[in-house]
Structures are given as C-alpha cells and as structure tokens.
C-alpha cells in the first residue's frame, strides 16, 4: 500500500548492534528486543540533512525508494522561482543550492565568538522574455549556519539547540458541540492550510449549513457553491439526500454565479465597490492560487485520507479543489445526519466521525529543517519584493542576476531565527544527559504554536496516541507542564512530520521479527499487544487470550489470532531520561517526573562513577550524547597522552583525537575528557576512547553510589533534610569543579580610549601582585571577591577636549590625563583559581565589535566541596537539602564497622509512593556484595544461567518495565556473598542491625541499608547565599536594589511592617523605613554620627515620599506637605549640598558607579 510506504521512510542511521569494548552489566531483562535503539540524535541530524539536501541523505532516500523527494532549500527555491516583473516580460529563477567548506573549525568559532557557518551559493538565471536572452550567474546567498555532528549550532561562539515544535497539522477537522439553548447537536468543520485563509462550514441550530470565509461573517453554504460555478439544479442533484442542504438552498436568495460572487465580495471586503471580475479574482486568490494558499504536502495527504479522495495516488497539489470543498460539505451533512460511513467520489468507503485535535494523528512536528526552511521562505519573499522593484527601475540591458538580488533580507531572517526565536535555545550543557534531552525536546510553544496562557488542560494531558511517541512522564513542573515533552526512545519522525513508533508484525497469532513503523492514526486501526505478552520459542502466544489495545479505547483481552502487532520493547513508551530510572514501574508518576527532570540537573563530579543499579540505557545515552570520544576506524592505539589519543587504523591511516581539557560549559560546569584506552590496545570502530563529563567507561555516570541508611536520626533529617558523612567532604566524593568566565573590553570613549594597564590610580602594590606587565592576572593565581583580574583605566573629564588641547596632548603625551579605575574585579561571593586567559586585540587583526580595541576573558575555576545547604537527589524524585554533615565516627555503622555515608528519613517514602528507591537500595547492596544462588529455588526459575552467580562489585541492569522482580530481590538478598569475616551484614528482608556511632549501642530496630545512586544537583548554596551591609541604591527611589546579581538588600515589605506595628516597635520601624532605606541625607548623617560617636540624629523625609509627591504633581494634582500647625513645608532641593559636603568630609562615594566590594565602599 502506497500510504504505508510513504509514511515508513526514515531509517535508523546509526545501526549500533552493540558498542564494542562496553563494560559488562548483568541484566535482569527477560524480553528479547528485536530492534536496537535508533540513533538518539536522528531527530536533529536527519532533518538538517534534508534541509541542505546532503549526499548522505540523498543516498538513504534512494535506498528507500522515495520518488521525487527534494531537499528543503531546493523546495523553497522552486516555490520562489520564477520571480516575474509586473508586466511578465522578465523573470528570475533560482536553482542548485550548494555549500562550500565551513570557514572555521568548531573550536575556533567557540573561541573567537564566530558562527559555525558555510557559504551558500545558488545558480540564478535571468530571462528576458522579450528577446529570449538568458543570463546565468552563481550568486552568494550569505553564510548559512551548519549543524555540528552533535546536532547543535554555534552562533556567535555559543552552542545552541533548535527545539522541534509540535503544531496542529494542516487538514480538515470535524467538530461536535451542543447548543446551550436548544440542546441540539451542532457540527462544524475547518479546513486549515499551512498558510492562507481558513474555510469553515457549520450546521447551526436552525438546521442550515453555513460557511465562514477567512473568519468573516457567516453565509449560506450554497452561496459559495454557486460562486464556484454550481447551478441550483446541480446542487439539488448532488445533495438531494439531505434535508438540511435543501432547506439551506431554499433560504438562499442569490440567483446565479455572478450574484453569489458579489455577495461573497461584500462580506469579505465591506465598503469596496464590488465587480464580478474583482470578486472572481479574490475567491481564486484565496483558495486556488499557490502563491496565496498552501496546504503543504501533509495537508493534502490528510485531506485525501480523511475524505477518501485520490486514494492510492501520489500526493500532489497544494491548493484546494472544488471537489475538496463539495466532499467536505457532504461529509459534514452526513455527520450531522448520524451516518457512520460515506462513499467518497472515488468509490472508497470512509468512516464518518469527528476528529480529536489532541490526537497525534492530527499533531505533527516541525523539526529543525522545516523551522529554518520557513524562516528562509520569509527572507526570500522579502527579497522577492526588492527584485521586482529593481526589475522595473534598472536598465534592461545592464541587468544581471547579481544586480537584482539583495541578500540582506535572507541573511537577516536566518540571523533573527537563530538569535531570537523562542525555539532556538541556549543549549543545556549541565551534563551529557541534559544536552541529549534538550535536542530531543518537543515544544508546543513558539511562533505558530500555543501560548502558555491559552493552553487548556486537554492539550497538556497525556493522550493514548502519545504511546511510544512522546514520553508521558518527562515534562516540566510549572506553567509549561504538558506543553513541553520529550521524544520516546524508539520514536522517529516521518517526512510528513508525524511521529511513528515501531511494532513487530503478528501473523495468524505468531510474532515475527519484521518491524513496522506506524503513525498514530494508522495504529488505531489495528490491535496491539504489549511487549511482555508471553511468547513461545516458535513465536506463538502462549495464552489463548492476549491483553491488547484496540483503537484509542481501553485495554481488553483478545483472541491471539486477532492480534495485528506487538510492541518491540517495554521501554518503548518512555524517553531517554525516564528510561534511566531503575524500578520506574514502582514509582508514582509525579515523583518519576521529578526524577527524570532532576537527572538533567546533576553536576559533573571530579570522579564519575557509573551506577551499580542501572537500566542498560546508560551506554547508548552517553555515546549518542556526544561528550565521549568514539573511535571511527578499527585499529591499534599508537599513542596516549592527557591531550591526544592516536589510533593507527587497519587500513594504514592515522587519526589523532584531541581531548577537551577543563572547558567551561554553557552552565558553568566543567567539561573534561580523559582517555580510557592504553597504548598498544586493539580498538574497534564505535569503541569509546575517552570519557567525558559524567561518564565512566563510556556509560552515563551522573552521581555516586553511596551507602545509605533509611532511618530518622535525632530529627536532623526532618522534612527531607539529609545527613551526610564527613568522609564525602574529605575524600572529595561529591566535589565538583565550576568555571566562571569574566570578560572586559577596552573601548573608545568620547574622552579618549580606555586602556588595559597595570598602572591603576590609588591601588597598592599588594593588590597588583598577581597582575603581569599588561595588567592581566597570571594563570594559576588564587583570587577571591574584590581582587583585580584585569586592570583598566577610563579617561575622566566633564568636557570634551578642544582641538588645540588634543594637539598638545598628541605632542606632549598623555601624562596629564585624569583617569578612573574601571578594572574587572572578581564579583562578590566568588573565588577560585585562574585557569585560562584569552586576549583579543584589534592590533592582532581579531574580529571585534565596533568601538572595541581590546577584549580580555579570564576563566576562574572553583572547586566546590559538598556542604550544608546543597541539594542532593536520587533518581526517583527523592530530593533533599543537606541538613547536617556528621563526623564519620558519629555516623551509624554496620556490625563490621563500616559507617554509612548518608542517612535518609523514612517519612520521605510512604506518602510519595516512590518505592523504587527502596528496591534500588536493596539491589545496590546485592550488586556490591555479589551473590551465588544455591540449589534450584522457585524464584530463580526465570533468571538466565549467567545470573545465578556474580562477583562482588557487579554492575546490574534492571530495564524499565522488565526489571528485577520483588521475589528475585528477596531471594538474592538471601544469596549474597559473605564479607571477609564470613558474615552477611544484611538479612533477607534487606535490613541490618545498625550501631549508633556516638554510643556504640545498636539502634532498637533493624534498618534498611544498601547502595543508592545519589546526584549532586545544580542548586548549590554557594550560588544562592548572599549578604549585604552597604551597596548600590536605585537612582529614582534611592532604596537599595534587590537580588544577588545586583548585590541588593532584603526588602522589608508591607507585611513585615505590620509585624513591627503589631509589636509596637515604632522607633525600629521608623529607622527601617528611613535611614536604613531611602532617607538620603539621614543615611549620611547617621554614618557621620556613628564615626564621631555622637547620638543618632532625627530621620528626615524618605526619597520615595518625594517621588510619590512628584508623581501626584505630574497628574496635575496640587499636593502640598503641611506641618502640624498647618503651614506648608517646602521640600528643598538644597539638601543635596549638605549631603555632598558631609559625604566629602567622610570620603563616601555617592556616584552611581559603586565600588564592587564592601571594603571599597567603606574606604
């Protein structure tokens, strides 16, 4: 069937039959998966390959047998061509887009703030239709941003990701509603194009069929039919079966086509004089001209499918036809009449039913390629206007394609998209998983999509058609819930933009290994069994009745012979992050959602450690995320150093792989690569050569395996607080490196050029000790807040220099100039070690913004040990803040003296229903201790042979929905290997007797003990803690600024004032509202009194009161301030002089550019 072939086109590009050299993980999986997980970045890379029409994409398309598929750029140029002038005597057409080599490497672009782009050229052909002369030229169309291998773009030196957008597909949508007054069934239909006017038909409560063109006033539908050239007799013949159509025809007063056209014109263009020709042109332009109306291929496909027209023919034509309109009206009339099926014009029987707009058969993805293509289309249509104007103004003889074309609009449109579009986002590089998830994200927001405020509950809710396409778990908490999702593991996008998911074909009750990809609406026509349905060795179902999903309805038991398809994998319905949660099936969905989201917030630690309890997804996720170095050709490792790995391939070629060393990610985390192969080692193609951040031996490793006890401890772990052992601090178990980038530029000012120098006024040599002769801090220097990183001076002066003065300065040098210190200092609250410096200068021909002569970047790395107030989390949504760090000797310990690392409260489990964390703890202990199954117990009958025995420190995989069962856990806990003393610490129930580290007494009850995987999250207390004594004030209100970034104060708000009033603390309140806030004169006087040891003076009038007065006066209200005896008080401006005098005496700087530190403010 043609339709099925067209839909199932995209293939798995990276067929990874298993990654060579991968670490061993013992798996509890019982179900064999016939299909490998597809390339996880294909969503991005395939779409971009289609856009640029790369040779690899063409090869894959040819191999699939796709006919007439053109690349995205070609498609747009074909649409645009030819551009004709207003008389039609000249035309310009474009073809053959091609790219030259990219201008600079990815690393160079990142370093120099450039865009990773390739020059785009097209062939432009100018034809003079009068003389038949043809001029052809290759035209440069601007630099086109290229996608990196990792599915990202580098724009102005920063890595960005274009998120795929979920939108309603063009097509016809039938809807049902009930009239509130009469309680009658009403039906309506909308024909929604990709671009152009909407066409709506409806049946109202008076049983007449109406039409709305382009959302204007309603008219009888027969007016439109007559305007399209149908006579009353033809309408009666076609719709004679329908009473409501006949009654509509009777009520329609228009006589013939001309009258109908004029009637429509009056509704669409009220106030304009109607003529038959203009009305005819208007109607044709609205729906039947490709320039104005475009259903797109997908819209045409959806209409053909819904209405049953042109079935089995190729999808062609992107405008409406008269047949479409008539068939749509017939479908609506039959729907209203309650018919269940209808015979389409081609003789095909189609079901008559209303549409569900939230169904994934009606929602499609606009992937990267299409989003950029739409933007280019906008740019080209702007260019088209320019070309037309130039055709009419320029001399015909002198015209060449180059003189007609202005590429500025195209370049600007592309730049605008990558720089400012809601869908072009700053890449989340917190860890490899967060980057991978970001590239697989699906957003319903953005231009042409929904807005947060308008989106209702139905759009956000989980829909049955999401199964295997969009993850029901992973979505943000908060206003975007349900509007942003994540692509499921096995899902892929077909050329129409619909998401497909794979199924195994079932023939006569026998499951085959043939895999078919189905879209959501195709899937609804079949019966689908679950992946865990019991199947015998011959592929036949073991049970007569199988639990299946039929259509969009509930589950039901069906005879084995009726089953059409079966899921390929139990993890088919979830996304990558969700598939990395072990025992997901035992967690409540709300907590699983938090677990999936919090894995993306884990910071890379100094030493990564893969989880003891994984799900088998870790390896593929890490390799596809692209932060590990993967070998390209099989061969032997020739040389290994910290910076390079060189591989001599079997075909005699050499390849050196460069490691990234301590680079800063977009989120300020540290990205570092470390080789994991040795010299002389044999490596295969696809093998991991070096670990990146958060990976160990090529597996995703976001946190640490810690020995956990689940018990309350003196109330210190109340309300999700966590107690940690001092060992984790001392041994840097949870220590991470954070790198901050500080930037300063030297510009030309009106008073002269700024200068980067070591010669800074009023600064001691002590402060300059770490600066080199240029005035830039040396690499390796330890710096803390307030230290100078780059010395810079700016000319100071009230007036511009006269030409004479400038001449004298030029002759005698600039010694006499007044300069002020504008050095780059370490911001408040930060410290660390300088690890890198980049200097860009106009003298070295670096590309700098206008007016900038020199730019210096300083990278400061900070090692952050774990501390009270940091946030930790497990993978099951079990998060908490560190409440106390205990000395190791005070921690509870096991009978063999091993102290636990972390104590979690028992109260965090029952109400939240994330039991997965308990099972993970038990299985973690089993993996750490190792096991050996004795005899032939009943619980072990489903375990594979290799699972009956495992050494200590074994890593385990328990895939989602197909993992270790409860009885297997209990059995294995009883089969764990004893420790060196021959004792088993933990009982069959997973509990151990713990001893109190302080007293040595055992705790009264056994405690659940085991190994849990704990992540350190990005919410670190160092980034949040903040204090201020003196600092900047707002210019208008003269009150302190707010927030850590502005070095602001704490707002003493309305409710806090009430509290003071309640206590009757009048003087304290007055002080808070005046001299501690915005009584400008009072502030200085109080400071003076404190310095001189005098009594605190009376407060004055707060600045905000003066602002209020001025605002009221600006509304033309004559407001005066009266004293207690009724005399008007003049609020003098002269107070400023007293203020300046007092400030000068005390040496206080009252200018806007406050010094960066408290010490400087006080000096």
Curated annotation (Swiss-Prot):
HAMAP family: RNApol_bact_RpoB. SUPFAM superfamilies: beta and beta-prime subunits of DNA dependent RNA-polymerase (SSF64484). One of its GO terms (biological process) is DNA-templated transcription. It catalyses: RNA(n) + a ribonucleoside 5'-triphosphate = RNA(n+1) + diphosphate. The RNAP catalytic core consists of 2 alpha, 1 beta, 1 beta' and 1 omega subunit. When a sigma factor is associated with the core the holoenzyme is formed, which can initiate transcription. This is DNA-directed RNA polymerase subunit beta 2. GO terms for cellular component: DNA-directed RNA polymerase complex. InterPro entries: DNA-dir_RNA_pol_bsu_ext_1_sf, DNA-dir_RNA_pol_bsu_external_1, DNA-dir_RNA_pol_su2, DNA-dir_RNAP_su2_dom, DNA-dir_RNAP_su2_hyb_sf, RNA_pol_bsu_bac, RNA_pol_bsu_CS, RNA_pol_bsu_protrusion. DNA-dependent RNA polymerase catalyzes the transcription of DNA into RNA using the four ribonucleoside triphosphates as substrates. The keyword Hydrolase does not apply. PANTHER family: DNA-DIRECTED RNA POLYMERASE I SUBUNIT 2. Keywords: DNA-directed RNA polymerase, Nucleotidyltransferase, Transcription, Transferase. The keyword Cell wall biogenesis/degradation does not apply.
